């Protein structure tokens, strides 16, 4: 019986020595991936993420990097490389019950707060940004728009302006042109008109001149003829002789008398006759002559006159015409020009305006969002207090420290296999690890973080004291049985 007792106690001690955690509660149903727990001093951020890297000097097995997830994802992500025996049932996700400091929720609260804050901030920011952006955008847009608008506007404006300007310019130009044209036209017209007028005037003048000439000629002829005829005929036959003598005498006397009398009479008669005849003749002659002369004269005169007249007339006409034309042209041109100019101007202006507006808007929005998140956390905390104390291992103070994790993984570097290692602690929360299937042939020195699977393991009952007491009692019993056998 004593030998059986010694054998039983010895077996118990040997098993306990070889498998120190076999009688402990190593159930990992409450295990969690390290990336889901908080382990820093202020309980507000995730535990610093670890990256396992190979170091040439073998002094450090782990390197810490905040840009890589802690330790590793669970092996379900690579089901294609894992056998059915290695697949495990996904652990139930445990909600993080850590209390968060008020106003420091960066998730739901900030999302809702930012949405509300951005709306208010953007409204104020855009108002200021658009004002500055439109000012710069309109300046550039109008410059391009006016160019196209004025081109179309000036075309229509100049057309109307030139019409009004030419009317006034032509009036002044024609006056100067006609003066020069009439001078040349009258010269040619008078030549033709005088020729026709003199013909008619001489005819009328000769009739009047001959009448006056004959009167004087007859008086002189009769005086000489009468003297000779009277002397011979007076005595005997003044009565009969005078009749025959006068006829012959008058004929000869009139011929000589008329020749001398007509010369003087015609000169005086023509002068008066021509004056009256020229007036009537010139009127008819000038009409025909001026028509032909003015056509050539006006052509040359108008060219010079219009040039000067149009310059002054167009200036006044274009001013009024351009005003109306530019208004319509600029409206269309500015619309297209402003669209492009405002786009660039508003982009720069809104950027600056939104930055300032969002800062103020987000501050107010985040305050409301964080208050809502705080209330939500308080409700979660209230529910947590009603749960069993077994979930206290979620507290960061109960989780393994960074130094503990580093030291444990370093200690099992050479012995880690594809099976789960023992929990790193015998009381509280620790970690355990194993190799992934695709890293089973790697040397220990070549292992990196991506080659390992890790998870949190927790023991509901601490057994440190029990181990000491039970081992001590076992040794005492063995010694007693041996000594008093």
From Swiss-Prot:
Record field: compositional bias (Basic and acidic residues): 371-390
Keywords, ordered alphabetically: Cell membrane, Cytoplasm, Disulfide bond, Glycoprotein, GPI-anchor, Lipoprotein, Malaria, Membrane, Repeat, Signal, Sporozoite
Sequence repeat feature ranges: 109-112, 113-116, 117-120, 121-124, 125-128, 129-132, 133-136, 137-140, 141-144, 145-148, 149-152, 153-156, 157-160, 161-164, 165-168, 169-172, 173-176, 177-180, 181-184, 185-188, 189-192, 193-196, 197-200, 201-204, 205-208, 209-212, 213-216, 217-220, 221-224, 225-228, 229-232, 233-236, 237-240, 241-244, 245-248, 249-252, 253-256, 257-260, 261-264, 265-268, 269-272, 273-276, 277-280, 281-284, 285-288, 289-292, 293-296, 297-300, 301-304, 305-308, 309-312, 313-316, 317-320, 321-324, 325-328, 329-332, 333-336, 337-340, 341-344, 345-348, 349-352, 353-356, 357-360, 361-364, 365-368
Amino acid composition bias (Acidic residues), ranges on this chain: 103-114
Record localization: Cell membrane; Cytoplasm
Propeptide segment residues: 463-485
Membrane topology category: Lipid-anchor; GPI-anchor
Modifications the protein undergoes after translation, according to the UniProt entry: During host cell invasion, proteolytically cleaved at the cell membrane in the region I by a papain-like cysteine protease of parasite origin. Cleavage is triggered by the sporozoite contact with highly sulfated heparan sulfate proteoglycans (HSPGs) present on the host hepatocyte cell surface. Cleavage exposes the TSP type-1 (TSR) domain and is required for productive invasion of host hepatocytes but not for adhesion to the host cell membrane. Cleavage is dispensable for sporozoite development in the oocyst, motility and for traversal of host and vector cells.
Lipid-conjugated positions (GPI-anchor amidated cysteine): 462
Annotated GO CC locations: cell surface; cytoplasm; plasma membrane; side of membrane
Disulfide bonds: 423-457, 427-462
Signal peptide: 1-20
Domain TSP type-1: 411-463
Region (Region I): 97-101
Region annotation 65 X 4 AA tandem repeats of G-N-[AD]-[EA]: where it falls in the sequence: 109-368
Glycan attachment sites: 426
Residue span of region Disordered: 72-122, 363-403
Region of interest (Required for the binding to heparan sulfate proteoglycans (HSPGs) on the surface of host hepatocytes), ranges: 84-92
Keyword Ribonucleoprotein in record: no
Entry similarity comment: Belongs to the plasmodium circumsporozoite protein family.
Biological role stated in the UniProt entry: Essential sporozoite protein. In the mosquito vector, required for sporozoite development in the oocyst, migration through the vector hemolymph and entry into the vector salivary glands. In the vertebrate host, required for sporozoite migration through the host dermis and infection of host hepatocytes. Binds to highly sulfated heparan sulfate proteoglycans (HSPGs) on the surface of host hepatocytes.
UniProt comment concerning the protein's domains: The N-terminus is involved in the initial binding to heparan sulfate proteoglycans (HSPGs) on the surface of host hepatocytes. The N-terminus masks the TSP type-1 (TSR) domain which maintains the sporozoites in a migratory state, enabling them to complete their journey to the salivary gland in the mosquito vector and then to the host liver. The unmasking of the TSP type-1 (TSR) domain when the sporozoite interacts with the host hepatocyte also protects sporozoites from host antibodies.
Protein name per its UniProtKB record: Circumsporozoite protein
Protein source organism: Plasmodium brasilianum
Gene name of the encoded protein: CSP
